[in-house]
Regions:
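Ferredoxin-type iron-sulfur electron-transfer modules in oxidoreductases and energy-metabolism complexes
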Residues: 24-41, 52, 62-67, 71-106, ...
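Hydrophobic or amphipathic alpha-helical targeting/insertion segments
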Residues: 108-122, 241-247
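Short FAD-binding loop at a beta-strand-to-alpha-helix junction that anchors the flavin cofactor
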Residues: 44-50, 298-299
Length: 440
């Protein structure tokens, strides 16, 4: 590395985000830009570690969830190039493994940093921020340009779904010379990138559409408002193309089939987030074609990234109160002995939505080890409250952990909107059934 002692000379540093109380008044991205000189210092912190676990992207020991970058980004190489001020070379190395670093650099949870060797004894290298800085600098300098293939293979490929998997698949196949058509059932290209992740986390016009326009200029064709399996049969695409690739994602949400589930005001998180972003892009919310949390008591069930996005969105609407339920225990402040480096550190943190809620209402909105028992509606059929109980995890007769209610911990929560953000069960069935594809 160009600065062998950099990790001892420079402390970890990130650009300061816009104030939570200011940023909840708009839908703009809230991460500020770090000066180039400070970015070079951060790149210098990447030590000559010998075995860079940051880009391992594999399981280290049986039973763990893996460590390092799942797409094997060449992290030490472009960190060193940033330190040297060789930004264009850093961009070239970044693009060797990552089609869309402007997406991952904004929304990836950065398992690379959890596996950084510097992080064993000190705060890890700011890999994620360096990554997004490289690609944004590349766009600013005009280095990221359309690169249509010099020759066409004569083969055609249909890609179903224009989310990150579909776009990456299309980019790779198009680069190999094949003619690619991407089918998207929504009115805009991007899938989860467009309608699943809120604008303040990933700007749609400046970031997502910028890349989509570049892909179009490279020769990829996009057909929106076209649901394969309904508007066009999957078999038709098989017959009309040399290959068909399914990139529809896991869009089937986990439900909560308890008493009162049919009451109005209980929504899947993606319905809430999708409608919000579509209305924002269509009319700046002037059309009111979204589920508004303004003045409402909002409860989010689920503690993952989607739940966090629901919190941030509800706050920007101007919700009256906000609570978030997590059935798992509160993570420890530091790694547990059962969660050693280089595994992803399961530790307590405030993500952006919880940070904003704490600034707005004074407390982290999350409650841990809590389970919803039933929903209760008013005389007009709208949700007005939900009932919960605290739980502890205990093993059943088969040795599996199951939630056990704690007697006397029952509580009633006022609720005008309930958002279910409990993960996803897999892909939808229509197209898979048509093509007789087996599922795990």
């Amino acid at each position: 590395m160009g600065k062998p002692t950099g990790f001892m000379e420079f402390d970890r540093s990130l650009p300061v985000d816009r104030s939570p109380l200011l940023r909840i008044d708009d839908w703009n991205e809230f991460h500020e830009v770090m000066p180039e000189s400070k970015l070079r210092d951060q790149g210098a912190r990447c030590m000559d570690c010998g075995i860079p676990f940051c880009h391992l992207g594999d399981v280290v020991s049986e039973g763990d969830k893996g460590a390092g970058c799942p797409i094997n980004n060449l992290i030490p190489e472009w960190n060193d190039l940033v330190f040297r001020g060789l930004w264009q070379e850093a961009l070239e190395r970044l693009h060797k493994t990552n089609n869309f670093p402007e997406f991952t650099g904004r929304v990836c949870p950065a398992p690379c940093e959890g596996s950084c060797v510097v992080g064993i004894n000190d705060p890890p290298v700011t890999i994620k921020n360096i990554e997004v800085s490289i690609i944004d600098h590349g766009f600013d300098q005009g280095w990221v340009k359309p690169e249509p293939p010099a020759h066409r293979s004569g083969k055609t490929v249909a890609v179903v779904g224009s989310g990150p998997a579909g776009l990456a698949c299309a980019a790779q196949l198009n680069g190999a010379g094949h003619k690619v058509t991407v089918y998207e059932r929504a009115d805009r290209v991007g899938g989860l990138l467009m309608y699943g992740i809120p604008n303040m986390k990933l700007d749609k016009q400046f970031v997502v559409e910028r890349r989509v326009n570049l892909l179009k200029a490279e020769g990829i064709e996009f057909k929106t408002n076209t649901e394969v399996g309904t508007d066009i049969k999957g078999q038709t695409l098989i017959e009309d193309n040399d290959a068909l690739v399914l990139c529809g994602g896991a869009t089937k949400p986990n439900d909560l089939p308890i008493e009162g589930r049919e009451i109005a005001g209980i929504h899947f998180a993606m319905d809430f987030l999708h409608a919000n972003t579509k209305s924002l892009l269509d009319s700046g919310h002037e059309d009111h074609q979204f589920i508004s949390a303004e003045g409402k008591n909002v409860i989010v069930i689920g503690g993952g990234d989607t739940g966090t996005d629901c919190c941030g969105t509800s706050l920007r609407h101007g919700c009256n109160t906000l609570a978030q339920f997590e059935i798992m225990p509160k993570p420890p402040d530091e790694r547990a002995d059962t969660n050693p480096w280089p595994q992803w550190p399961n530790v307590y943190k405030l993500d952006y939505g919880q940070e904003e809620a704490k600034a707005r209402f004074g407390d982290d909105p999350r409650s841990y080890l809590i389970m919803t028992q039933k929903f209760v509606g008013d005389d007009e059929g709208n949700v007005k409250e939900l009932h919960t109980v605290n739980i502890e995890w205990d093993k059943d007769e088969n040795g599996r952990f199951v939630p056990k209610p704690i007697v006397g911990s029952e509580k009633i929560w006022p609720a005008d909107i309930v958002l279910l953000a409990m993960g996803f069960r897999g892909p939808e069935d229509t197209l898979l059934d048509q093509l007789e594809i087996e599922r795990d």
